From Swiss-Prot:
HAMAP family per UniProt: NucS (MF_00722)
Domain of life, per lineage: Bacteria
Pfam families recorded: NucS_C, NucS_N
Keywords, alphabetical: Cytoplasm, DNA-binding, Endonuclease, Hydrolase, Nuclease
Organism for this UniProt entry: Streptomyces avermitilis (strain ATCC 31267 / DSM 46492 / JCM 5070 / NBRC 14893 / NCIMB 12804 / NRRL 8165 / MA-4680)
EC number(s) stated in the UniProt entry for this protein: 3.1.-.-
Cellular component aspect of the GO annotation: cytoplasm
InterPro entries: Endonuclease_NucS, NucS_C, NucS_N, NucS_N_sf, tRNA_endonuc-like_dom_sf
Family classification: Belongs to the NucS endonuclease family.
Subcellular location: Cytoplasm
NCBIfam families in the cross-refs: PRK03298.1 (NF002876)
Protein name per the record: Endonuclease NucS
GO molecular function terms listed in the Swiss-Prot or TrEMBL record: DNA binding; single-stranded DNA endodeoxyribonuclease activity
Amino acid sequence: MRLVIARCSVDYAGRLTAHLPSAPRLILVKADGSVSIHADDRAYKPLNWMSPPCTLKEGSGDEEGVWTVINKAGEKLIITMEEILHDSSHELGVDPGLIKDGVEAHLQELLADRIETLGDGYTLIRREYMTAIGPVDILCRDATGQTVAVEIKRRGEIDGVEQLTRYLELLNRDPHLAPVRGVFAAQEIKPQARVLATDRGIGCTVLDYNAMRGIEDDKLRLF
C-alpha cells in the first residue's frame, strides 16, 4: 500500500464531473489497483475513488505532479499535486479477513443447509467459496442456473455491500461462473446499504435468525 499526503486538487470525469479544490489530503494506492482520496473528517469514506481494475499514470516533464487514474470504462480521476508532504509504501501481505462472529457463522450454516429459502430451485455450490481476495460466504445457483454469490452479515451496512461488490467483480471474470449476481443477506439492512446495493443490481434479503434456528415456518423477507 502506498500512502501519500499532499496538497492537491482532484477532478473526476466520467458519467458525471466533479472537482475538489486544493487542500491537504490522504491518497491511498492499494495493491489491488484501487486509488482513493480521503479528508480528515469522513471516517472510512473517501472523497473520491477509483475501483479496480484501473491504471495509474504519474506524469513527467510538463505533466510532472499530475496523476491520471483511468478505469476500464474510460472514467478518469486526475490528481494535481501541489506539494507532497509524505510518500511511503508498505507491504501488508495477504489479509486473513474478518472473523465472523457466532451469529454470522451460524446464519451462513443455516442458509447453506436451507438454500431453498432464497427461492424455489436454488442449489448450493459451496460455503466459503475461496477467491483471491477472500472467501465468499455462499455460492449457489438459482432456478435458471445463474450463479449467485451471497454475503451474510448480522447487520448489513455499506462496507458489506462494498465487500460483495469486490467479490462480484472478481467472480464475473471466471467464464465458468459468469454471469454472477449478488445477494446481500442480513438480520438488519441499513437504508443506505440497501440503496447502494439496489444501485449496483444486488438483491437484499432480511434473515429471521430465530425462525431459521428451528421454528417450522422459516421466514425470509425478500426485497
